[in-house]
Amino acid sequence: MAQKPNFLKKIISAGLVTASTATIVAGFSGVAMGAAMQYNRTTNAAATTFDGIGFDQAAGANIPVAPNSVITANANNPITFNTPNGHLNSLFLDTANDLAVTINEDTTLGFITNIAQQAKFFNFTVAAGKILNITGQGITVQEASNTINAQNALTKVHGGAAINANDLSGLGSITFAAAPSVLEFNLINPTTQEAPLTLGANSKIVNGGNGTLNITNGFIQVSDNTFAGIKTINIDDCQGLMFNSTPDAANTLNLQVGGNTINFNGIDGTGKLVLVSKNGAATEFNVTGTLGGNLKGIIELNTAAVAGKLISQGGAANAVIGTDNGAGRAAGFIVSVDNGNAATISGQVYAKNMVIQSANAGGQVTFEHIVDVGLGGTTNFKTADSKVIITENSNFGSTNFGNLDTQIVVPDTKILKGNFIGDVKNNGNTAGVITFNANGALVSASTDPNIAVTNINAIEAEGAGVVELSGIHIAELRLGNGGSIFKLADGTVINGPVNQNALMNNNALAAGSIQLDGSAIITGDIGNGGVNAALQHITLANDASKILALDGANIIGANVGGAIHFQANGGTIKLTNTQNNIVVNFDLDITTDKTGVVDASSLTNNQTLTINGSIGTVVANTKTLAQLNIGSSKTILNAGDVAINELVIENNGSVQLNHNTYLITKTINAANQGQIIVAADPLNTNTTLADGTNLGSAENPLSTIHFATKAANADSILNVGKGVNLYANNITTNDANVGSLHFRSGGTSIVSGTVGGQQGHKLNNLILDNGTTVKFLGDTTFNGGTKIEGKSILQISNNYTTDHVESADNTGTLEFVNTDPITVTLNKQGAYFGVLKQVIISGPGNIVFNEIGNVGIVHGIAANSISFENASLGTSLFLPSGTPLDVLTIKSTVGNGTVDNFNAPIVVVSGIDSMINNGQIIGDKKNIIALSLGSDNSITVNANTLYSGIRTTKNNQGTVTLSGGMPNNPGTIYGLGLENGSPKLKQVTFTTDYNNLGSIIANNVTINDYVTLTTGGIAGTDFDAKITLGSVNGNANVRFVDSTFSDPRSMIVATQANKGTVTYLGNALVSNIGSLDTPVASVRFTGNDSGAGLQGNIYSQNIDFGTYNLTILNSNVILGGGTTAINGEIDLLTNNLIFANGTSTWGDNTSISTTLNVSSGNIGQVVIAEDAQVNATTTGTTTIKIQDNANANFSGTQAYTLIQGGARFNGTLGAPNFAVTGSNIFVKYELIRDSNQDYVLTRTNDVLNVVTTAVGNSAIANAPGVSQNISRCLESTNTAAYNNMLLAKDPSDVATFVGAIATDTSAAVTTVNLNDTQKTQDLLSNRLGTLRYLSNAETSDVAGSATGAVSSGDEAEVSYGVWAKPFYNIAEQDKKGGIAGYKAKTTGVVVGLDTLASDNLMIGAAIGITKTDIKHQDYKKGDKTDINGLSFSLYGSQQLVKNFFAQGNAIFTLNKVKSKSQRYFFESNGKMSKQIAAGNYDNMTFGGNLIFGYDYNAMPNVLVTPMAGLSYLKSSNENYKETGTTVANKRINSKFSDRVDLIVGAKVAGSTVNITDIVIYPEIHSFVVHKVNGKLSNSQSMLDGQTAPFISQPDRTAKTSYNIGLSANIKSDAKMEYGIGYDFNSASKYTAHQGTLKVRVNF
């Protein structure tokens, strides 16, 4: 046991003090106590434990009683325990008397047995302030058999038999003499509630008000009510006290009376008080105050044997368990009941944890007031089914029903708080029921909203009233009364069904209701289809944002009046079951129009959603459901009218309409998705779409509107209300001739998609009435007829098939609004139906009427008039074959387009000849109609003015006879044929004078004798026909208006030679007129400022071009006949104008324009045949247009003839004006008259002049050698670069192209190479000067201080050292002497090793690395050169006679040079693009210098060193070839470059500067470098194919340069040197800056 270690500690400390002479039997094994002997002491007189008197001591002896002795009371004498902290094993009653035992000192006893004298007892008196501690320790057989008395004789206890632990059978009354006396149970072998240590009925308490009862170890059951009178009862952790006792009076046991208290000690507060209700004993426990508290104490009421009651003495409204504050609760409260035995708690219960357990099913617990386990508290149901009834608001905390069929009953208006779980061990076991009698609430005890309030079998609303639920519930909701209402708070989740099983008390379910205060979820079915199990109402929260999510498959409402109510602000029902078909047997009641949402968007195509009820209100006071979203389900709207503002259909979803009235304001669906099904009904064939319904939309049409399988009445009629629109890909039927559309409500409707177009599944009929306009957008098929009545309009946008179209009241209109060609298919009829008022063509698409069937004798449509309106300009209407034009009225309001784009609507007639007479209405002056022959029939026009043109649908078809002209009143028609290239009429005949205000497009046109035709006008000016002038004698005339466009194949012929006239009234394209054998009488051009394009030959007795400008459009145009007059420009293009015969006179305004195409060699010519003569004075300017794209890579002169037969040209051409177009700018043109008197055009190569001029005007004009290089470039005409240059169109581009090739950067690069090597030499010279300065004794006067002298002397001790000098140089050379400048940046480092070979000689070696980037400037800007150099040097310094010295170096440098030079390339279109010519070559530079100097102390601390010497450098590039360009890579051959320089200058060293241990040596210097000899190499470069090389540009850099610089050397010790320096170099148009660092390590 957990208490044993403490107990052992007590007995070990207490068992050492005894004072007795009795025999001792050890009560323990000796292991724990360390006892060597076991004693038994018997009484023979009044005995105490302080001495041996009264015990079985030896004669004359007074032996103290040993610790842990068994005292066997075998004499009728009292026993007094006077030993302080006395510890005896036990008391054994072995006399037939009750014995008195007095506790005068704290005493511990084990067993107290009367096993030998069972009717007798020890009666204890505990003195004031003393403790009787009972451990219940027993003894074993071995111990009982081996005890010895005080004489050490074997004396068995109980005959050697064992005495069980916790044998307190001999315990009688306990009298507390005075306060505070203590009785303590501290059992060595602790007992439990299941097997307690039971004190018999003789164990009583006397004067309990003076005493304290401590239960420190063990579970004690008392049988006498006197224990309740103990002043203080203390129960330690895990220990217990059980009252199974006699009552105080009338079955009642009073606890904590008169200030008595029952306390629960210990850290955990797990001590337990058990109150047992038992027949013949106490059944009611009346508690003064409260039991437990401060989260301590477990109190159990056990009524397993008989019903019992726990009562608060202050009344039920007072706490009986714990108190109502955070820490005031008891640790636990347990109620144990059994079948039929009720437990009643009449008082408030505040316990942290509560247990309801029933030994067998049927136990009942009634709480007559509050039950509250507090935050984090628990309630557990155990063992068997039970029932709990509460009467006040209660908190059961986390409640575990333990998988028992347990019920909690909540009375009217009360709140039950908790989190109720059917089975903690298995969440799937949803046991337990919570039943509300009427009004009430069930709320969570947890602050975590994610913790379920219930996970049980059911929550029941048994009576009329409102049960409020919140949080998460995994339970069935059951309604037991028509007035029962579950009210769900916002966020409530019911994870279970509603009204599926009978109530707990087997009462039947009732049609109660559910009311929502916010969003909620119900996952199970609602109602089970039974009359009483169906719900009456579900009322949603009055909040549009709140959602009721239903996951059940059956949402069953009452058969009559069952409704889901959407309040004023709507709300949402969301159906979430994705596995089963769903049935909603409710009306959906809408309070405010366009509110409420039913969201079934998660349903799949495998599910059917059936709504058996009305939705909203359709008729008066319309109230629509804001949205019904069916997801992808198959939805059936059944058993009621439906009003929906938005119907949402997801992919493949469908909605079935079942012969009610449906208002669906808007359908939302993905394009081409969703289906509406019109169901069949044997009793009712009508389904009505209420006014304002829209199925689908233009942007997102439905997939299908479908008429289901027919019923007994065969047809299904869809009555379509006012303004209803049907948008679907297809409107279909399952059976042929089933499905009719009736539009009888007025307004305008749209029907989209294919209607009834499936093979064998045509719809039945279509009816329009009552002023309704219906527009069909797709192909439409009705097997029956189409009726248009009551001034209704049927608008057709696509192919339309019906038996016939009729209007019984002659008020119907058929309007075509199609944008593409369509066909209307009708059946021929046996008799006419009602005639339409009119047929209107409003769209741009053509319409063809096609009639089928051979039985009928009349047409399937008839109309009073045809009218073209709106967008029908240019639209063709093909009348049913056999319909003549004779009596038709054809109107138009669409005009005829613009002046430059005449157009007209068209009526096509076929299969019959027609005649048009005066008075027949066809078009008007502002609205011309086009009549077209669709077959080889004829039209005879007798009307004087026909506001129409006539054309044909195919070539060589149709005959037109025009006879409407009258004397002095020519007939008028608006065109015969459409335009050039369109089908030609077969024959047109003019029998009277006519004005044709359009084109003539026909195979043959005959103008009868003495008839004049004027043709061309607003309807067209094209001419593509053969006109025959005259029917017999040829005296006919044709006149062409301005802007006549004759097809080149058209012609005008005369019946007889020299008869008939042709007149052009304005600009014209002219084709063939007359023939060599039959010329016409005259051809005249009478317009002003006009021109004629001649496409064919003209043969006429007289040709007068007037002042027309002529353009020759055919390769050869012949002018023949008698005389020809020309007084305008002749533009030959590249064609020939041939004067075949006769005399041509050119007036003063005559000029010639010709075009030379050099690439083909074609030039426009005038050819004067031998039988012809041209007379002219000096003509105007001769314009020569030249298209010259040919290559100019030719030499000499090319010639082209302009006038052939010049000997027959009597006149002089005007001075030429050359207009050269094309890419060739390198040729020169002239016009000459050769020895044959022909006029000839010459073409001469002019490349050298063009290039020289272009370069002279460019930036390189003054560049040295550029003129020579240009000449060499142009001499090499076989190079690719030369030929590419000839593609140039702009002379400035030519200069750029040539300049990039003819100039170079070699001089600059060579100069930089030499300069880079010289920089390294300068660094070596500087190094030598520094060494000499630091190490030479002659400089000691400059040291300036002791410290300086020491430092200087240190250098003398250094034999060698390593140094490094990194540097950075920037240099800029401006343009000089015509040579482009450059900018160079050099970075590098020189690393050297030097040593003092002797006192007067220093030598060293160095290696250097440099990197130079050159950016060339001026006309070479964009060119770049990179140089990477590696140098090797030897250097030294020799001290000569005093103060004189010599120093020098030798250097060898290898440079890797990479150049990028800009070159150019011309595309074939003359566009110039940039290319890069890349060079990659090696350079070698070497040389050396020798300089002499003298050290001179000019003044104290100043050393002046004048110096002079010579330097020599030589450089050489390897030969290389550039890469990277198309035509401009050059091959470069180089020679050596060298340079000899004179160097003169001086250095000045000042006094050292000492900073702590650092010495600084300052220095300044200046030098002049003058080039005394040497030259740059003359590099030669050539392009591929070039014979003479380009010469390189000369060296124009300055010969003299100037340097000034300063430096400082720093020494911190003898081992390390540092330095910094700056140099500035300057020459003519040249500057350079260089910075240097230095570090040296001396060894």
UniProtKB/Swiss-Prot annotation:
According to the entry, every stretch annotated as the Autotransporter domain falls at 1355-1643
Q: Name one Pfam family in it.
A: Autotransporter
Keywords assigned by UniProt, alphabetized? Cell outer membrane, Membrane, Periplasm, Secreted, Transmembrane, Transmembrane beta strand, Virulence
Q: Could you name the domain of life of the organism this protein comes from? A: Bacteria
GO CC, sorted alphabetically, is:
cell outer membrane; cell surface; extracellular region; periplasmic space
The keyword Repressor is assigned to this record: no
Residue ranges of the propeptide: 1329-1352
InterPro entries registered for this protein in UniProt: Autotransporte_beta, Autotransporte_beta_dom_sf, OM_autotransptr_brl_dom, OmpB_passenger_Rickettsia, OmpB_ricketsia
Effect annotated for changing residue 257 to A:
In strain: Breinl
The observed outcome of changing residue 1010 to D is: In strain: Breinl
- Keyword presence, Membrane: yes
Family, according to the entry, reads as follows: Belongs to the rickettsiae OmpA/OmpB family.
NCBIfam families named among the record's database cross-references: autotrans_barl (TIGR01414), ompB_ricketsia (NF041657)
What function does this protein fulfil? Answer: The 120 kDa surface-exposed protein is a major structural protein which may play a role as a rickettsial virulence factor and/or immunogen during infection. The 32 kDa beta peptide may serve as a membrane anchor. It has been shown to adhere to biotinylated Vero cell proteins.
Query: Could you tell me what this protein is called?
Result: Outer membrane protein B
Task: Tell me the lineage of the source organism.
Answer: Bacteria, Pseudomonadati, Pseudomonadota, Alphaproteobacteria, Rickettsiales
